[in-house]
């Protein structure tokens, strides 16, 4: 995939991410719990009822997680990495970054977004109600199934998108 196509796909993915977060924050109902964890050189875990967040990072890295409405968010960063895990209204998201930037967000019941990268400068994994999405390095690739999902890894050029019925995948 040439650089122009990769950039265009990255910009499109970024636009979709912003739109998804705008819709999710604008249309949500009151949540059972809102939790925020952040870490630089530490490990922070908060559990309240059915909601939980965790952020862990070495001194050169930063991790944040945000949870609303019985979600779970986990972020783990090492080697100068940045990661964010956002679980909203029943979603479960986990991001593990080594030296790059990784964002994982899951919105709605039954949604799961998992990401782990060692070499990517930027990767994103999003999942909507009933969706299952994962991103990793080249050996893992991008996985989209179930409900609405979006995955992209800029280092490998791998990505996928699912509307819950059909799935599109980049090599």
Language-model segments: residues:
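Terminal non-domain segments
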Residues: 1-50, 167-171
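Low-complexity repeat regions of mature extracellularly deployed or surface/particle-associated proteins
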Residues: 33-171
């Amino acid at each position: 995939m040439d650089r122009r196509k990769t950039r265009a796909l990255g910009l499109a993915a970024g636009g979709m991410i912003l739109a998804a977060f705008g819709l999710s924050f604008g249309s949500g109902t009151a949540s059972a719990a809102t939790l925020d964890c952040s870490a630089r050189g530490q490990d922070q875990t908060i559990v309240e009822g059915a909601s939980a967040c965790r952020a862990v990072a070495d001194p050169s890295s930063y991790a944040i997680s945000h949870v609303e409405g019985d979600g779970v968010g986990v972020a783990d960063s090492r080697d100068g990495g940045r990661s964010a895990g956002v679980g909203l209204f029943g979603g479960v998201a986990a991001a593990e970054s080594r030296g790059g930037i990784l964002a994982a967000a899951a919105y709605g019941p039954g949604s799961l977004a998992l990401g782990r990268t060692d070499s990517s400068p930027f990767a994103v994994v999003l999942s909507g109600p009933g969706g299952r999405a994962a991103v990793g390095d080249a050996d893992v690739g991008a996985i989209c199934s179930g409900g609405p999902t979006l995955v992209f890894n800029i280092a490998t050029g791998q990505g996928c998108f699912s509307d819950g019925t059909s799935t599109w995948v980049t090599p």
